[in-house]
Amino acid sequence: RQLPVEGDEETYPGDLWYVPQVEAAFVPADLKLMIDGFKGSGYTLYVNGREVTETPVRSYLDAEIKTVPLSGYFVEGTNTIAVKLTVTKKSDGMVDLLKLTGTFAVAEADGVERIVPLPGTLELGDWVRQQLPYYSGTVYYTAKVALDQEQLQRKLMLRADVGKDVLLVKVNGQLVKTCLWKPYAADISAYVREGENEITLGVVNTLMNLLESTRNPSGLFAAEIVPYDRYEVRF
């Protein structure tokens, strides 16, 4: 964001403070802060009154986005993150959201969000509503399906509803198809066998949930295997 009050050139450089608070029911061992969008000549990062001295390293998202570990600075309860940013012109300031990453979920109660442990499993439906509001990445859903010889004589189409996201279809450990858009369907006939089969559906959602906190609905909303009769027509 641009500075809320534009000063004269004589007022620069100057220091701005950005001070959010984060509630944590536990502290993930891999908790990190993503550093992106700091416009200024330099910054100093503090957590709970302690200066973070670790050297930022490249994030998994982008070479320009850096991360620093925070697990050694966080505590259970209320945590205060403070960024002192030295600005040198009117357009300097905090231009992107601060982002925390790690192995955790986010619970909300009375309008307050809190870092909590990941749920053991997810149900079909929107994972944003299952304590993963800002997760961007891939979630895999796995089921066992038993098929007999009669069913194997038919063409078996797997169909799924993943909203506007990307679908990965795997059968018995083999990648069958990557569906980038509708129809989210794949012919799995050549990948199944008599008896038990493992069907894995991966859903890859938008990065906007992480980068912009948009809470776009994400997840596997429905899935089915539809059998079709095979016909041969000769002329």
Regions found by a protein language model. Give the residues of each.
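An acidic-aromatic loop/edge-strand motif
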Residues: R1-P13, G37, R58-A143, K155, ...
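Regulatory/sensor and coupling segments of signal-transduction and defense proteins
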Residues: E6-T11, Y18-A24
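Aromatic side chains
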Residues: Y18-P20, Y134-Y135, Y141, Y184
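Aromatic-lined ligand-binding clefts that engage carbohydrates, nucleic acids, or primary amines
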Residues: P20-G49, I81, V145-N172, I199-L201
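Generic structural detector for well-ordered beta-strands
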Residues: Q21-E23, P69, A105, K144-D148, ...
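Generic low-polarity alpha-helical segments
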Residues: V22, L33, Y43, F104, ...
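Solvent-exposed beta-strand/loop surfaces of large extracellular or lumenal domains
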Residues: G40-T67, K164, K170-A185
